From Swiss-Prot:
Residues 1014-1160 form the MGS-like domain. It is an enzyme of class 6 (ligase). Residues 212-404, 748-946 form the ATP-grasp domain. Signal peptide: none annotated. This is Carbamoyl phosphate synthase arginine-specific large chain, mitochondrial. One of its GO terms (cellular component) is cytoplasm. Keywords: Amino-acid biosynthesis, Arginine biosynthesis, ATP-binding, Ligase, Manganese, Metal-binding, Mitochondrion, Nucleotide-binding, Repeat. The keyword Ligase applies. Mn(2+) 2 binds at residues 375, 377. GO terms for biological process: arginine biosynthetic process via ornithine; L-arginine biosynthetic process; urea cycle.
Amino acid sequence: MALWATSMRRAIPGISKAFLGSNRVLETAGVSQLSKHLLPQWSGVPHRKISASATNFNDKVKESNTPDANAYIRSGHIKAAEHEKVKKVVVVGSGGLSIGQAGEFDYSGAQAIKALRESSVHTILINPNIATIQSSHSLADEIYFLPVTAEYLTHLIERENPDGILLTFGGQTALNVGIQLDDMGVFARNHVKVLGTPISTLKTSEDRDLFAKALNEINIPIAESVAVSTVDEALQAAEKVSYPVIIRSAYSLGGLGSGFANNKEELQSMAAKSLSLTPQILVEKSLKGWKEVEYEVVRDAANNCITVCNMENFDPLGIHTGDSIVVAPSQTLSDEEYHMLRTAAIKIIRHLGVVGECNVQYALSPNSLEYRVIEVNARLSRSSALASKATGYPLAYTAAKIALGHTLPELPNAVTKTTTANFEPSLDYVVTKIPRWDLSKFQYVNREIGSSMKSVGEVMAVGRTFEESLQKALRQVDPSFLGFMAMPFKDLDNALSVPTDRRFFAVVEAMLNQGYSIDKIHDLTKIDKWFLSKLANMAKVYKELEEIGSLYGLNKEIMLRAKKTGFSDLQISKLVGASELDVRARRKRLDVHPWVKKIDTLAAEFPAHTNYLYTSYNASSHDIDFNEHGTMVLGSGVYRIGSSVEFDWCGVSCARTLRKLGHSTIMVNYNPETVSTDFDECERLYFEELSYERVMDIYEMETASGIVVSVGGQLPQNIALKLQETGAKVLGTDPLMIDSAEDRHKFSQILDKIGVDQPAWKELTSVAEASKFANAVGYPVLVRPSYVLSGAAMSVIRDESSLKDKLENASAVSPDHPVVITKFIEGARELDVDAVASKGKLLVHAVSEHVENAGVHSGDATIALPPYSLSEDILSRCKEIAEKVCKAFQITGPYNMQIILAQNPDKPDTPDLKVIECNLRASRSFPFVSKTLGVNFIDVATRSIIDQEVPAARDLMAVHRDYVCVKVPQFSWTRLAGADPYLGVEMSSTGEVACFGKDVKEAYWAALQSTQNFKIPLPGQGILLGGDRPELAGIAADLSKLGYKLYVANKDAAKLLQPTSAEVVEFPVKDKRALRAIFEKYNIRSVFNLASARGKNVLDQDYVMRRNAVDFNVTLINDVNCAKLFVESLKEKLPSVLSEKKEMPSEVKRWSEWIGSHDL
């Protein structure tokens, strides 16, 4: 059987491992009595013989019927569980999105809260991430927008008196704080029960020493390793296990603080850095080049276990799984390997005592049955979100039910409605996950990828073959990727052997253009030859299309072969020299079209009512009927810098309102981390590309009633006009108007026409013209391309010599659209206006104030609402501008404007208001303004878009509020080795957090502590000051009065601070180890670096100061206005921090207490 399965898989291209099934018998309860009576083998073919006792059981359940939960319990073989008697449970969220911990925890936390509410448990969520779905009022009973720290959670527990807490749905943040609270005795003192996996198990899985001992007890092999807590111990350990070694950190996230060391020097600097981030590291023998395989396993308290999904990394061990291409189910494992690792996973989860979901990662030798366990995550993780979406098995929901004491056999599968949760999913399709990196946004960043994660998001594609699935995924990662495509490299062998974010394209280049054999590529990359043979299939079809060279050479056979191999219309059009629309028309004439298939978790072996859908050309029938004519909502696609969970909140809010108003909804999205791709958010969910081709295919097949393009960020906007021009009904604002607002030239002309002020601007066609204009208006100037998200290629230029490079860069971003150059106004304030209109009339709006001056991207800005320093006159002028703009563009739906407030020398009392940007779609601040003001802007926008139950206009800014909410950015600088932590017009934050307070200082104080690893420096500790801003003197004077010891790196900086004195310390810019010793010697716990420009190179003192503050895990403040606000917050809040009498801070309040009602 094993040989048959393996040979069949190799013989039939793309046949999925799980499709062959190969005797995946349910591994269930440890009680032998129970295992005899469970239904055998429903998750694959062929079936095993049924034992007599099992047959008796089947007589009761009737083998022909799909099993159901009640039948299991009625059979008498399984008792219903004793459920946890909890009435009020705290769910701990994960905080702001960062590299290594992203939207997957919004999805898992939201599912957990749904599961608790179903069981009539009162839920209290603590999560400062205001952009999440889980922090919407319709889910948890009460929400605290507060830092997920031991201090704030203790206050919450004392205030709310819960009887249970869930720690496994908030990533590493929740897990770490839970362990901390347990060590402090907070749970025991307050009689709070940790639900699900016990704390002792969490500690064992996180502490590398305990973990190694636990696995040795059951003879499970792990890589030879030594746990250490000092640099000297690390060096001794490396001698013991021998180089090369890998360092892994305890209690860390996404491989933070891990890496490979080939010698003593590399290990010394790496160990020092890792130990500044985490108390313990593991020095382990490197297994680079082995296969990496993962299993997602679920266990309940009655010891029932199932493996939900196994996944295989396309990349060999050595690249963090979060930065790897991952395929599910595994494609290259033999049946023996599959079962060996599956059995080990179940053995591990039982021995550790996990109650809920668990992820086991293995290294598997490519040449033998030898394997090692790399790590176990005894919590929901990024891989669990992927496994859940890949199989359709609601992992987080099931884990939450198990935490309440339910067993797997008694839980119905919430997705299929016909099976129990004790069913192992079976797949008749292939899923491919590819990470998304945004490394090009960062100056000096190292592009190499290794054991520490750097990607900011991921995509998931579903196809019936590996080729189809992979090509879809490649296009989903970035609209500029056509799919299977090559990129040129100066040193191709190096690009293949040293992995970077572009390595895949180096593999294609080697195969397609340089004639490298599969063996040679395998030797350089260690990628399995099975995967490389599939790439060779794609290369063959690619060349075939290239040789045809014309549209009319495309016959049905070649067209079908290309589509089955995953080629898009656009990709084919480039290869045959035609337009995308021509290829589409020819394809339809040849009657080649995609088929809609279900992800039903049962490989169609049982009827399942599921709404998870995908399209494939490797099929011959549809799995569904098209008679609902639903409204399509286009999601936001992959999370990347500039487009993140905020847009998922918008998409889900829109779909929920549509359903509330009686509309059937069709969601199109491909991001496995999102709530929008959850099984119960829409009538139909297409896990599909957000390309013109695929959206139009779905629109035509579904005969949809319309498409909403304004809630998914930039991707849907980019295809809106083309959809409308080819017959689709785009709902809301006319795409021609969207185009006018996106094109900087058209947009500026319209503003001039309606009398709305803007900075001086000019459309550019040559560098000479640009130079002439810049000299006329005076430097600095801002170069802005059209159609961008998060300020890509937008630059402030301060002199003529920089102009040429920047302009060429901007042209590369959007070659079809002209570039506009604008006068950049230094020292101006910036405001955000978020609004909703209906047929050109303003319905609601919010005016938020940036703390930083204009010049910092709005996505990286600290934003306060209600504004804390704006006059009534400025607010009414902002409203007037919002009204003029929505009338001019005839807006129906959401829109956002950025306005700068600049001093007018002629009228000092009346500052100028100039519009610098306008997006005719929802912006990333929509969840923030909605939750702060208590009105869901997307709900209002959706009603406006479909012209149904549109609410009357309201001026929300005229209402007096006795609170302020402050949103601050979450950066992931620690992940991006070498990147300069400097704020500018190009966005670099990966997430956001927001907190409420009685004033801006209190809200900012709480919000800062909500960001990852932010530590408040205490009086008596050292603060290092740097930069050239004159405001440093006043800030230093205040810090000195508060009792901090001040240090500077040179005499010029010391002069700048006068009359406040600061000690000049040695500052070796080239010697990181010596610099670390100086930070330790002077107990430097914070760096205030207020430089007016980026460093010219990596030896620039300000750059070194900022970068090493991040590397040494020291609090960094890098903006003048934020520094001033932070000092004001310290003055107000330090007395209570230092007081021995610990009182409840005034910011510890429920969201409902702040906003006063659930207007949302």
